Amino acid sequence: MDPSKYRPSSAYDTPFLTTNAGGPVYNNVSSLTVGPRGPVLLEDYYLIEKLATFDREKIPERVVHARGASAKGFFEVTHDISHLTCADFLRAPGAQTPVICRFSTVVHERGSPESIRDIRGFAVKFYTREGNFDLVGNNVPVFFNRDAKSFPDTIRALKPNPKSHIQENWRILDFFSFLPESLHTFAFFYDDVCLPTDYRHMEGFGVHAYQLINKEGKAHYVKFHWKPTCGVKSMSEEEAIRVGGTNHSHATKDLYDSIAAGNYPEWKLFIQTMDPEDVDKFDFDPLDVTKTWPEDLLPLIPVGRLVLNRNIDNFFAENEQLAFNPGHIVPGIYYSEDKLLQTRIFAYADTQRHRIGPNYMQLPVNAPKCGHHNNHRDGAMNMTHRDEEVDYLPSRFDPCRPAEQYPIPACVLNGRRTNCVIPKENNFKQAGERYRSWESDRQDRYITKWVESLSDPRVTHEIRSIWISYLSQADKSCGQKVASRLTVKPTM
């Protein structure tokens, strides 16, 4: 018998109830007891199996991005960028690749309202002919900290108080007062974009710089941008409260219902590219994840379109067990030296092994759709049928060989081991430029959010003064307006 033919699937459902082992179950209502009143007998195997399965049917939720929704579709190349990359899925206009996307909030639990102020996750898994490419981003182009040593503390500060389980402004502002580079992300976090109307009406960003490599081996740094064809829409604070009180899953419902109705969400993919020789020509470090690249100097280049035209079949299998990893790249795309990206390559795979298990890549939603082969073996819940006699390489009895080498960036590294910050921090300029780009009513909403947060009674005078200093260094009038509404004298 083919051991993989009857792999558990609803396609092989019987017309009657069975145990996990396939034995028939004739009573699904009454436990087996001594007489009509009990006690219950341990030999009621199906009862024990049913309860034990129920006790274990949930897996640990994601430590971040726990609340989310997924959908399937395709990515289609619309513009030729083969001069920039040898990635097969970007080979020519018209090339299509199946994808699955997951949108999420970042901080709160799996059942939390989707209307809360938060950064949103925007992750895309491309099932290419050369393996999976995971572009794991957010709806804002920057992040709070540039070094992963601060990442666990960043998330803890944003999450609820471990004593009361209440998210509190004083904790957030206390921690980030030590990270002035976070101000640029706060210019998004306290802005309208972190109250998106739904998932369909928000942008997406790869956040980090990656590298594109062409067939000649020439590399360019690249940033990825998703632009929704239906436009960007946000809610006011009042709308968010009303929507959250009406339906805590409003964004999931909107995504699901839109696809079911044939109103398929679509995003255009754009890239910015930079020659590595130009990295030192800017007044900031282009590989600093707290910075954006100026579009007037590095314009957006159109690449393709993302269309979500299929709802997932099972929420647990294709959303909860769906696993992304920035380490999953394909030939023609490579990592940059971005410190946060470098550590995410490890952390994402590690958290999936903890959350789902060591063989999480064997799950259908995570497995590549192309042929693949290695000697990673066994482990808990291994589902792969393997009949090889050789489980090592190299071997004269196994024809498997290393793949042909593909171009990767040529990079000569040399330097002293050190723990230090980057030379060009420039923490406030871009936050100020963003603030000044807004209309006055949008500026006022941003200031109001700062005043509300800094008015937390546990925010000390010292913390308020630090933040007013940061805001003033970004934009003097912004700092003055916040200070005047708090009756605190600005230090700059």
UniProtKB/Swiss-Prot annotation:
A Pfam family the protein falls into: Catalase
Entry GO CC: cytoplasm; glyoxysome; peroxisome; plasma membrane
A GO BP entry: hydrogen peroxide catabolic process
Molecular functions (GO terms): catalase activity; heme binding; metal ion binding
Residues binding heme, per UniProt: 348
Active site positions, chain numbering: 65, 138
Localization: Peroxisome; Glyoxysome
InterPro entries referenced in this protein's UniProt entry, alphabetically: Catalase (IPR018028), Catalase_AS (IPR024708), Catalase_clade1/3 (IPR024711), Catalase_core (IPR011614), Catalase_haem_BS (IPR002226), Catalase_immune_responsive (IPR010582), Catalase_sf (IPR020835)
Cofactor(s) annotated in UniProt: heme
Keyword set, alphabetical order: Glyoxysome, Heme, Hydrogen peroxide, Iron, Metal-binding, Oxidoreductase, Peroxidase, Peroxisome
Gene3D superfamilies (UniProt xref): Catalase core domain
Catalyses which reaction(s): 2 H2O2 = O2 + 2 H2O
Coiled coil: none
EC number(s) stated in the UniProt entry for this protein: 1.11.1.6
Function text: Occurs in almost all aerobically respiring organisms and serves to protect cells from the toxic effects of hydrogen peroxide.
Assembly, per entry: Homotetramer.
Entry similarity comment: Belongs to the catalase family.
Name listed for the protein in its UniProt record: Catalase isozyme 2
